[in-house]
Amino acid sequence: MQIKPIITYSGSCPLFRSLESQILNAIPLDTCEWRRTFQRPTKHVRLEAQAQQFNVAALEKYKQGDWSILEHPILHIFVTECNDVDTYKATIREAIDIWLKTLTSYGVSDWMILLVETLDMRKTKNFMPRTTVLDKIRLDFGTKNDDRCISVLNPAKFEQKSTESFRCLVQRIRFLMLTSYNRNIVKYEELIRSKREKRNIEGWDFRQYFFMQEDLALIFEKLELPTEALIQYDELDAMFSQFITHTGLNEKQQWLNHFRKPLDAFHGICLTRADKFEMRNKIRDEGVSLLEFRNYLFERQAYLLLTCNDIPEIAKRLLNFLFSTLREVELIKLECQEGALCCWEFVCALEVLQLCEQAMEPNELTCFQHCAPIWNLAKDKLYELGKLCGLLPGCTPTSEQLHIVVQLSSGIGDAPSEQHQFLQATPQLRDRSPNRKPKKSGAEQLKEALGSNQAFQKLYLELAELAISTYKHVTRLRSARLVGLDLGNFYCALNEPHKAVGFFTDLLRELKAENWHMLSSQTLLELANCYRKMGDSLAYTKTCSSISCCAELETLVRTFYFDEFLKSLKTLKTTLSAQPSIENANYCVLEDHFRILDIEVVNQKPIIQDDYILVQLKVESLYPRGVVAENVKLCYELEASSLELAMENVSLTASPSTVKAKDTSSRLKVSLQLVYKQDNRLHSAAVACDLPKSKQPVRRTSSTKRKLSPSVQADFTNFVQAENIALQPGVNLIEMKAKATRVGCWQFKQLCISMSSLEFLSEQLPFMPATFEISTKPASATLEFKTLIAGIVQPISLNVSGGSFIFPPDAKITLRCSKNLRIRQARNTDDEAAYNDDQSFESTLQVPLVQFKSFEERRIPLEVLTDMPGRKVSKHHEHHIALNCPWSRTELPIAVDFQPAMEATCRLHTCGTQKFLQVIMKGMEAHLLLQHAQVKCDVPGVQLLDLNPESQQPIEIYKSLTVTYLYEIQVEPLKTEHELPVVKVHFVIKYASLSQPDVWRTYGCAFDLVDYTTLFKLQAQLEPNELCRLRTVCNMNLKITKVHENPYTDLMYEVLNDQNLWAVCGRSAGVVSMKDVDSHSISLDVMPLSTGFLPMPSIRLSKYTAGGKSKTDGHSKVHPFPPGQVYNSTKSMQIHVIASVAGDQ
Amino acid sequence: MAFCIAVIGKDNAPLYLTTSDMEQELELQYHVNAALDVVEEKCLIGKGAPESKELYLGLLYSTENHKIYGFVTNTRVKFIVVIDSSNVALRENEVRAIFRNLHLLYTDAICNPFYIPGESLTSKKFDRAVQKLMSGTA
């Protein structure tokens, strides 16, 4: 159907017909600017036209409102050839007036008056007329429309001269046509709107309305406005859907019965029809089914979108078109054959997909986004048809199904004849390669697929692959994997489970990664089915184990697969021995089956080397029933602190902060490798994996089936384990233990549970477990004692701690004492005789360690005894005991300090020429009994008199208590100090401790008596003798008398006064000479400062050596006399001082 | 009114998923899972452009029987609603209202101080309210 605007002609019709072909051919040669109304953008359009003779019938339709914009003339032309003014006035003017009034009466204002001129007539007349016919016409009719009156030279006679004139005519015709269209389109839209508003009135027919609006769309399409045309079709589409949706609301739409035809024919859309309006004629004349009508609508819309070069929009609209049409078919309850709609959907999908394949950039990606679900839909519909016709794998079509195939094939129909120029007419599409044969249409492909099982499978697999690849291309990976799920099921039905496993595994991996547990469970069920068919018992076992641990599945399903798991677990060993490949890993992810809740080291005391590590593991089993684990291992590794320390010491180029930032919970055990040059300079540093080569620490993450296996296996050199553990559903407490063999700070890394020959390896532990330390406990021997006292038996204790040392049967410890120190093993106090015998102490003691075992601790009580020192050498008496232990080659010296039990001092007292010896015993730490104190002197001529009372009972002393003994020393007068300068006396006393009152030991102390002869005698006397008054000067007479001959001639006396008691007036010291006299008197003045009985002022007598005799000794020296050589007879005399009376002064 | 309402976390893990028809639960879960592709696609488009304020993503995709709509919060939590295709009376603004109410319910649920973000939504009050929302009585 040609859609061309209609131009009517009137007047000199033969003349116009002679010009018609030239005019109509010239109109499409150029574009014309179209200034549209309502602020729409200006557009350049290319027009075509057809000519008809003026007819009032069309105008009559226009007047009644029953007109179509396709059939309505858009321009009326009156043609005349009159060149004579008089002839114009006589006949032509009247004809034009009648014609114009006719147009005006019908409301048409689109007209043009064309005057064809002939130059010959001008040449014959030699004068110029005053007015031309054109001027007359414009004066009469074109008062306001000068542009509608135009003259043109006749091109039939003057081809060369009339070119410019003719071009102006054609341009004017184009302009007036477009102006007419502006007015007509607006009027036509108003007509359509009024028709639409009457759609609820009885008798209204959608089909008539449809053709009206489609006419407008066709005009828009003709005017190169495909977008505007598309809007018209979209409005028709929406209105039709709305009518069908609300068809139950009222029964007035009788026209719907025209679409209620049975769907005997269900061919899909065809975008390459030779005759685009074939279906339109059918709609008008015969009536079509709903499906055919919908197909026509979509074809028109697709064609317009193709004109806009918007192929992705076609793909975008397809699914909505298919789904909404299906709903409409259901709503109006059309009868159709089973599978017919599937065929229709399939053919429609393939039609659009073939069109999209030819799309070019930049529409390609957007087109693919919309194509992917269309491929999926085609695959799904083909599957439904295969199920219906018995074409699925493993099925054979029955005769009834074959009949269905025949009926469906006839319903699909033949492909309409294609317009091959279509592809050439649209240069936006990609050209096909000449070598590629043209693709079959969707209908042909479907018929071929329904014809045989092999063809069906081939097409189905092809469509599925295309869907997956297209989804992946537009990065819709989840949708791609769902298509893979369908394809995997199809391969299972084809008995090719090895191809299906890849799809299921991909889907499972993604679902598990995003925690879609329910969908993961379903995929595991599919995988188990595949592995069972494949005979892969290892994978089947692992999958059954995973299924039985899925909480989302029903208990019956879990129990069934748990039984399958146990059954195949028994046969797994045989299978694994037959396939010793490393790729066939027997590892599972532990977290799928168990949940690690807690790991606790339960050793109370520090773990010693060769001791046992006790670990309590809390694990939750996800199995539905109990399962026996042959082995449960938990490996531990050294902490990385040592490596960090080593790396910090190396001068690397990296900064120390970078080194310290190293993660201490590294999953791989790595070590530092340093490469040095020959001159010991560092060449390079590297970090290498420190594992035996026989083990593979890292495995390649395969893209098919091994992705779900743990990727890293820790080093299981050191582990704690438990064997034959029954794991019940829920929380299990497992006691694990192992021998601690290596020393260091350890950290748990990985848990491994073994069943038969299947190992469940955990990923990283869910929490940071506490570290534990294994240390070596060395054997040790120590001496334990409190404050030790010399002179009495003291208890000590030998503590032997075995540690990890293995003792020989005859092991013993040798204790060797220093000089004067003796030791023995502690005796039983019941055996008093042996206890009191000091002969049992020895300087060397061997302590046998009878049957001493490792980690045993034994306490051996001992006793030590040492003599008290005779002199006060130091505060502590030091001894040491050397231990010789079987676990050490060197002796271990232990210092032992003793305090003396008591100490003795002596003083020499003088009374005139008599000498007395005082011995003072002072108790220290011990509680002792004393008796039989004696002083002996072996020097002849010296006699000691014991002045102490006779005592029968021993004297008891303890800390801070003193006992004093007094003896008189008498020296024969014939013996002078010159002959006996030193008198040596020995003090001997017997003592016993309170704990051993019957054991008496002797304590001896020697004293040396020197300077014991009295040389001088001091006497002091105060005057007045009895009454000294306060603050009154008294006279003190000091008399020094030589008692014994001595070499000292010069003496110095000093008054040592107390500042609060006495004040010395005048000289307080002086030097006297005793060279030739036996006595010397000195008079001193003293004054008392206090009342009461005051002691006599102290006087010190010293030896004086003058210092002026030699040059080297320039200072005098004063040496006090020892107390034995000076006797002060008035030392303890007291003076009564009374208060002074003011009147006496 | 709705066949399925799902709340998906920002790591695409399902936090809450309920269906009105138990027999179709598996199929609806697959639909929700596939809808995440389209959600990511729309969010990715908005990544280059200035951040869009529109949380409602509109129709994600359609099947023969269902229409799947999406909504994404500022914290990248996704709401997916699956609606019956034959329910032509349901307007788009009504779908927006469903999402708006669902967003309010979700914010109320996660205001619980004992709720750990990222965990499944197990609030009974939330479940009852969503059931009402799904049946169209909310």
From Swiss-Prot, chain A:
Instruction: Look up keyword Cell inner membrane and say if it applies.
Output: no
Q: Which GO terms describe its biological process?
A: early endosome to Golgi transport; Golgi vesicle transport; intra-Golgi vesicle-mediated transport
Which UniProt keywords are given for this protein, alphabetically ordered?
A: Cell projection, ER-Golgi transport, Golgi apparatus, Transport
InterPro entries, per database record = Ig_TRAPPC10, TRAPP_II_complex_TRAPPC10_C, TRAPPC10/Trs130, TRAPPC10/Trs130_N
- Gene Ontology CC annotation, any one: TRAPPII protein complex
Where's it mainly located? Golgi
Q: Which domain of life is it from?
A: Eukaryota
Q: In which tissues is this gene expressed?
A: Co-expressed with Shal in the nervous system.
Where is this protein found?
Answer: Golgi apparatus, cis-Golgi network; Cell projection, Dendrite; Perikaryon
- Pfam families, sorted: Ig_TRAPPC10, TRAPPC10, TRAPPC10_1st
Assembly and partners are described as:
Part of the multisubunit TRAPP (transport protein particle) complex. Interacts with Shal (via C-terminal dendritic targeting motif).
Concerning PANTHER family, the annotation shows: EPILEPSY HOLOPROSENCEPHALY CANDIDATE 1/TMEM1, TRAFFICKING PROTEIN PARTICLE COMPLEX SUBUNIT 10
Q: Give the UniProt family note.
A: Belongs to the TMEM1 family.
Its biological purpose is as follows: May play a role in vesicular transport from endoplasmic reticulum to Golgi. Has a role in one of the several mechanisms underlying dendritic localization of Shal channels.
User: What protein is this chain from?
Assistant: Trafficking protein particle complex subunit 10
- What is the source species? Drosophila melanogaster
Organism lineage: Eukaryota, Metazoa, Ecdysozoa, Arthropoda, Hexapoda
